[in-house]
Amino acid sequence: MNVSYIAHISGRVQGVYFRASSQQQAIEYSLSGYARNLADGDVEVLLCGDEENIEKMLLWLAHGPEQAKVTEIQHEKVPWQEHHFFSIG
């Protein structure tokens, strides 16, 4: 079943290829959506697709790429959003 989740990731997550790595991982899991930097230093990630794959992606986001240091991740299910690819904003 296709669903959408939004996640906010805190820690050392900007300037460490977090968004680009998230895009690569999302593509591996056949997910669409986006990853974008927020003014407060966090990263926001929208994930759209199969719920099982989103759960796997959320586990990956809890650690992120090697250079990142995730201190907190918050996520919630949101109304379905149609995205055809995963973009970086």
UniProtKB/Swiss-Prot annotation:
The keyword Hydrolase is assigned to this record: yes
Pfam families: Acylphosphatase
Tagged with keyword Flavoprotein: no
Domain Acylphosphatase-like: 4-89
Enzyme Commission number(s) of this protein: 3.6.1.7
The protein, known as: Acylphosphatase
Source species of the chain: Colwellia psychrerythraea (strain 34H / ATCC BAA-681) (Vibrio psychroerythus)
InterPro entries in alphabetical order: Acylphosphatase, Acylphosphatase-like_dom, Acylphosphatase-like_dom_sf, Acylphosphatase_CS
UniProt superkingdom: Bacteria
Similarity field: Belongs to the acylphosphatase family.
Catalytic residue list: R19, N37
Gene giving rise to this polypeptide: acyP
GO terms of molecular function: acylphosphatase activity
Catalyses which reaction(s): an acyl phosphate + H2O = a carboxylate + phosphate + H(+)
Keywords (A to Z) from UniProt: Hydrolase
